[in-house]
């Protein structure tokens, strides 16, 4: 597919509709896509004729995340700066979306994971449906929840964000609405009518657009097996200070009242990279006290260290096992939580030495930013 057709652009009066168009790849975000999206969003913000931007995905996914295999190939070929540039552009796009002066609506009628979650959750309106599947599966890939996840996961009720970020748990549309990851739930059968109403919008007034969305929104019941029904257990366990203490708390729950959900949660943690569990927990905890810009700057430092592989090579190994060879049997190093020391974790949060082009993330100038977006120096 020609790169220019990976993001389809449609104009409907004062509305711009951007559609991810890599359905066979579940709309995995290529470098061209994130670059094009950044260019378009910046242009639309300055164009007085554009009042609203709508994001959609072709096929059964909004976006399953970043297009990671090319980045892994770059790492293996020693072209780390190319991978860093991909994340730099992607995180800048996340920042622009989180500070955007015009309303944008993301229609999440399918899979929403990783980078796809960043594009939607950093925006103003997120529309889930009965087809929505949300996850941040990074710890199983040798990575950590990024794209601003340390900001938005840390602001979910209680310690639900730690649970979602560490386990990679999948949420449906009703759960997304309940925890705040989605702003509205609209049955997929109503999307055509909703979009037709949105395309008539001649205003950037957030309240006006919210009123349109409210008219089509429903409040679905949570599935009886939903993890959101277990907030008390999640808070007891995932509020612990360390990953080791989280494991111990879950194991105590199992001895007192064993059930399939607890066992599945422990199993998900056991499959994840020990290093990435520890840096993910710290990242989310730090995110509670930081603006979204600060979170993205820190996450960029972290992802650069992950790519360099000086501390651990789990990113390449995890992607090999899950995305490339697909044997789903990663050989993590270190293999045990107790072998991941505090000093190793600390290194992920330090500035990358200014060599070979490495430098901290810098955002384009933004005007009239809310306090949540302030990108203070770390």
From Swiss-Prot:
Pathway: Amino-acid degradation; L-valine degradation
A Gene Ontology biological process term: valine catabolic process
Keyword Transmembrane helix: no
Pfam families: ECH_2
InterPro entries per UniProt: ClpP/crotonase-like_dom_sf (IPR029045), ECH_dom (IPR045004), HIBYL-CoA-H (IPR032259)
UniProt binding sites for substrate: 115, 138, 146
Keywords: Branched-chain amino acid catabolism, Hydrolase, Peroxisome
CDD domains on file: crotonase-like (cd06558)
Motif stretch (Microbody targeting signal): 376-378
GO CC terms, sorted: peroxisome
Domain of life: Eukaryota
Keyword Hydrolase carried by entry: yes
GO molecular function, one term: 3-hydroxyisobutyryl-CoA hydrolase activity
Catalytic reaction annotation: 3-hydroxy-2-methylpropanoyl-CoA + H2O = 3-hydroxy-2-methylpropanoate + CoA + H(+)
EC number, UniProt record: 3.1.2.4
Localization: Peroxisome
Assigned protein family: Belongs to the enoyl-CoA hydratase/isomerase family.
Function comment: Involved in valine catabolism.
Designated name of the protein: Probable 3-hydroxyisobutyryl-CoA hydrolase 2
Provenance organism: Arabidopsis thaliana (Mouse-ear cress)
């Amino acid at each position: 597919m020609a790169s220019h057709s990976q993001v389809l652009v449609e104009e409907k009066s004062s509305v711009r509709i951007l559609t991810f168009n890599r359905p066979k790849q579940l709309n995995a975000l290529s470098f061209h896509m994130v670059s094009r999206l950044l260019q378009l969003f910046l242009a639309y913000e300055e164009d007085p004729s554009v009042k609203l931007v709508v994001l959609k995905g072709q096929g059964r996914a909004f976006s399953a995340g970043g297009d990671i295999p090319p980045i892994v190939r770059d790492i293996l070929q020693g072209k780390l700066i190319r991978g860093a540039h991909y994340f730099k552009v992607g995180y800048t796009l996340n920042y622009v979306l989180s500070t955007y002066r015009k309303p944008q609506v993301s229609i999440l009628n399918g899979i929403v994971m990783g980078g796809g979650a960043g594009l939607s959750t950093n925006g103003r309106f997120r529309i889930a449906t009965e087809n929505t599947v949300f996850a941040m599966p990074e710890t199983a890939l040798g990575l950590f929840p990024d794209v601003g996840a340390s900001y938005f996961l840390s602001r979910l009720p209680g310690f639900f964000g730690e649970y979602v970020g560490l386990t990679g748990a999948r949420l449906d549309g009703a759960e997304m609405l309940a925890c705040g990851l989605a702003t509205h739930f609209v049955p997929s059968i109503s999307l055509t009518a909703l979009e037709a109403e949105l395309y008539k919008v001649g205003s950037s007034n957030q309240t006006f657009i919210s009123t349109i969305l409210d008219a089509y929104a429903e409040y679905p019941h949570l599935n009886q097996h939903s993890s959101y029904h277990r907030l008390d257990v999640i808070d007891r366990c995932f509020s612990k200070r360390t990953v080791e203490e989280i494991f111990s708390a879950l194991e105590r729950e199992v001895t007192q009242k064993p059930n399939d959900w607890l066992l599945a949660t422990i199993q998900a943690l056991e499959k994840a990279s020990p290093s990435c569990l520890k840096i993910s927990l710290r990242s989310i905890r730090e995110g509670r006290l930081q603006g979204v810009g600060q979170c993205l700057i820190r996450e960029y430092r972290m992802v650069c260290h992950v790519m360099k592989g000086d501390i651990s090579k789990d990113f390449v190994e995890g992607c090999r096992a899950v995305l490339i060879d697909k044997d789903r049997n990663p050989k993590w190093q270190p293999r045990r939580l107790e072998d991941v020391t505090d000093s190793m974790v600390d290194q992920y949060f330090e500035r990358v030495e200014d060599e070979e082009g490495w430098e901290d993330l810098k955002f384009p100038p933004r005007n009239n930013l809310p306090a949540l977006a302030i990108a203070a120096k770390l």
